[in-house]
């Protein structure tokens, strides 16, 4: 073969391996978002955020709040998709300290924190939005021809 017709070798595929599983957690049917605060893992379970120790899997905290989908952590606060808004939560007190509108008007499906911004995925619209965490303003949008449920 000539160099014009040869293809680069594809990397060998390995089967996925489950390294660790957590749960089940009491009174929890599903998990809709997960983030790590440097010490604990936080899981959004519909009506509350559950914190657990990643080494043992033991729950360490529970914050009652609406949590429909994605969860993110900025180094100080938790951010939680809750219906048509994003709540900024103080993890020590569980209090919502601010709220901004969610870009998908209730159709948001995942969230992450990176580059000083929130990144919000919209599964149905196949978009990921970079959001200003103080104002909720969409800074940019990435469109995809594939599912974009979680930007993490």
Question: What do the PLM-derived regions correspond to, one by one?
Answer:
Residues 53-57, 90-94, 132-136:
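Short loop/turn segments that connect beta-strands within beta-propeller blades
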Residues 58-60, 97-98, 139-140:
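A structural motif specific to WD40 beta-propellers
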Residues 76, 95, 116, 134-137:
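Tandem repeat domain/solenoid detector
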Residues 27, 41-47, 78-84, 120-125:
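Conserved beta-strand positions in repeat-built beta-propeller and related beta-rich domains
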Residues 25-38, 65-75, 103-115, 145-152:
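Beta-rich, blade/repeat-based domains predominating
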Residues 7-28:
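A short helix->beta-strand "capping" segment at the edge of beta-propeller domains
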């Amino acid at each position: 073969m000539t160099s014009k017709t040869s293809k680069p070798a594809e990397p060998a595929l390995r089967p996925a391996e489950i390294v660790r599983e957590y749960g089940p957690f009491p009174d929890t049917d599903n998990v809709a978002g997960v983030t790590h605060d440097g010490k604990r893992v936080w899981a959004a379970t519909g009506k509350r955020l559950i914190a657990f120790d990643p080494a043992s899997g033991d729950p360490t905290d529970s914050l009652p709040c609406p949590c429909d989908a994605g969860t993110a952590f900025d180094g100080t606060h938790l951010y939680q998709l809750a219906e048509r808004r994003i709540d900024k939560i103080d993890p020590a007190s569980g209090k919502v300290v601010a709220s901004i509108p969610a870009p998908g008007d209730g159709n948001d499906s995942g969230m992450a924190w990176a580059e000083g911004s929130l990144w919000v995925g919209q599964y149905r619209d196949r978009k990921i939005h970079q959001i200003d965490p103080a104002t909720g303003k969409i800074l940019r949008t990435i469109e995809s021809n594939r599912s974009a449920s979680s930007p993490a």
